[in-house]
Amino acid sequence: MTKPIILTGDRPTGKLHLGHYVGSLKNRVLLQNEDKYNMFVFLADQQALTDHAKESEIIKESIGNVALDYLSVGLDPTKSTIFIQSQIPELAELTMYYMNLVSLARLERNPTVKTEIAQKGFGESIPTGFLVYPISQAADITAFKANYVPVGNDQKPMIEQTREIARSFNHTYHCDILVEPEGIYPENEAAGRLPGLDGNAKMSKSLGNGIFLSDDEDTVRKKVMSMYTDPNHIRVEDPGQIEGNMVFHYLDIFGRKEDATTIAEMKEHYQRGGLGDVKTKRYLLEILERELAPIRERRLEYAKDMGEVFRMLEKGSQAAREVAGQTLAEVKEAMGIKYF
C-alpha cells in the first residue's frame, strides 16, 4: 500500500529557534518516526529570496545552519527526503504553468499575502516574486503530490489556494494528475506559537527575542535570566502574576508530566508571594537544558563534517528532482506541450 505523502519546510533566513521547534520540528520528527508517511522536507531558498533578494549571502549561510538544525532535532535523511528548493528547476517550470490559471486579483485577495505585505512594509514596492509566491508554494506541494502539509492556522489560505490551483488544472486539462492537499493544523494554536522571551506575541529572528537551537548553555542561561516576568513582582515576598509571565508560559510548554506537580506548586507559591523570579528561571533553565543539551550535542557532531551535510542535501535534492520531474512530465503531457 502506498504511503500518504507529507511536504513541509522552512525559509533559510537564519538559524532555527525554539519557536520552530515547538511549532513544527518536534511534530515532523514524530510523523517521520511513525513510518506511516513518505516525508519530504525542504529548505525554501527561492521563497526566501522573494523578500531577501539583495541579501542572498544570508540565505547561502543559512542553508547549512538549517540543515544542521534539522539533523540535530532528529530528522533522518534515511527516513525523510531533505532537499533544497532551488536545486529542483522543475518547481519553477510548474510555477510558470500555474501562473496562467490564477488571476492577479485572486493573489491580492489572499489574506496571508495581504497580512505579510503589511508586516514587511512593502507599500507600493511589492516584489512580483513575493506576490506570486503562493503559486510557487502550490508548485512545491503538487510536484510531490503531497496529501498533507503541516502548517499553522494562519496558512490556511495558502492551502486553499493550492487546492484551487490543483482543481483548476485538473478541470482545465481533463485529468486527475494533481492532488488537492489537506493541511495538518495544530490542535492548540497557542502551544504551536511560542511567544518571545520579551513577551512579544511571537519568537522571531528579526526581533532578537529567541533561543536558538544552536545556542550554547551559557547563552541560554543569560537569555532565560533576562526573560519577561511580572514587572510588579519587585520583591520576593510580593504576590506575582503568572498570566503573561513568560517563565511560567514556557514551563507549561516544555514541562513534562513528571514536572506537573512541581510547576503547579511553584505557580501557587509565586501567586501568594515568597518565590523569586531567579528561582523560577533557574528551574526553567533545567527544563530547557534537558531538551536542548542532546540537540546541541548532535549539532556539534554533525558540524564537524559540513561536506557530509551538503552531500546529504545533494542526495536528497537528486531524489526529490526525480519525483518532481515525473509530475512535470505528466503535467506537460496533459497540457499537450510534450513534443518529443
Region annotations inferred by a language model:
Residues 16-22, 40, 54-59, 78, ...:
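Structured ligand/cofactor/substrate-binding pocket environments in proteins
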Residues 163-340:
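Conserved nucleotide- and phosphate/pyrophosphate-binding catalytic cores
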